[in-house]
C-alpha cells in the first residue's frame, strides 16, 4: 500500500517510495488501491523518494500540467552531496542534453537540437564529515537535472553512482516540498514531507526541522 498524505475528488498526494517508477508502476498501484483512474502530471526518478501529486481525472491533469508549464507549480528538494560549495547559496544554470539510449544527461557548452536550459537554486544548510545538506529549488524540470548539475561541479549526490558518487547506497535526494493551485477550487495547496529514517539524513536531523527549513528561502 502506498502512503497517502491527502486525497479529494481531483488529486491525491503520496509519499513516493524508492524503486517504483511514477509513469507506470505507481499509477497502477494507486488505481488498484483507490479504484479509480490515475493521471501522472510530474515525475521523480525511480530511485528518488518524496512527495508527489497525481490527478484523478483528465481535467485536473490538464490544469496541473499547464501550471507546471507556466511555472506555477513549485518543487523543492533535499540532497546530501559529496564535499561542499564555496558559495552558501547560488543559482546554477547549464545547458543539458539527455541521451535517451543511455538514459543519461550531460552538461554541454553549446545550444543544439535536443539541448535545453536548466536552472536551479540551492542553499547549503550545513556540512558534516565532508558531506553537505542542500535545500534545492527546481526552476526547470529536465531529466536528471539536479543530479547532473551538482555532479558537473564535482559535488555528486551521495549514492548516485550514475553521476559519479563513490557511495553504493541509496541516492540521498528527496522531494521535500510541492506547491500548486488546486485545479478545482483554486486554493493554494502546500505539502511538505521529511525523509523517512536514513542513516545519512539522520546525521543532519537537527537541520531537518520543518520550521527551520521554511525560513531558508
Model-based region annotation:
Residues 94, 118-120, 144, 187-191:
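Short beta-strand segments
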Residues 1-119, 126-129, 172, 198-207, ...:
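RNA pseudouridine synthases
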Amino acid at each position: 500500500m502506498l502512503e497517502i498524505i491527502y486525497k479529494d475528488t481531483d488529486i491525491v498526494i503520496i509519499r513516493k517510495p524508492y524503486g517504483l517508477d511514477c509513469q507506470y508502476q505507481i499509477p497502477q498501484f494507486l488505481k488498484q488501491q483507490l479504484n479509480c483512474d490515475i493521471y501522472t502530471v510530474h515525475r521523480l526518478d525511480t530511485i528518488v523518494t518524496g512527495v508527489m501529486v497525481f490527478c484523478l481525472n483528465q481535467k485536473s491533469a490538464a490544469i496541473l500540467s499547464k501550471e507546471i508549464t507556466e511555472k506555477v507549480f513549485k518543487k523543492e528538494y533535499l540532497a546530501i552531496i559529496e564535499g561542499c560549495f564555496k558559495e552558501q547559496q547560488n543559482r546554477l544554470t547549464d545547458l543539458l542534453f539527455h541521451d535517451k539510449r543511455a538514459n543519461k544527461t550531460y552538461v554541454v557548452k553549446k545550444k543544439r537540437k535536443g539541448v535545453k536550459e536548466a536552472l536551479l537554486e540551492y542553499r547549503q544548510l550545513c556540512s558534516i564529515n565532508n558531506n553537505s545538506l542542500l535545500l534545492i529549488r527546481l526552476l526547470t524540470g529536465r531529466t536528471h537535472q539536479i543530479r547532473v548539475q551538482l555532479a558537473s561541479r564535482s559535488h555528486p549526490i551521495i549514492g548516485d553512482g550514475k553521476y559519479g558518487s563513490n557511495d553504493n547506497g541509496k541516492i540521498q535526494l528527496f522531494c521535500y516540498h510541492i506547491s500548486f493551485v488546486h485545479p478545482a477550487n483554486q486554493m493554494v495547496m502546500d505539502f511538505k514531507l521529511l525523509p523517512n529514517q536514513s542513516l545519512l539524513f539522520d546525521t543532519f536531523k537537527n537541520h531537518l526541522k520543518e520550521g527551520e527549513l521554511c525560513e531558508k528561502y
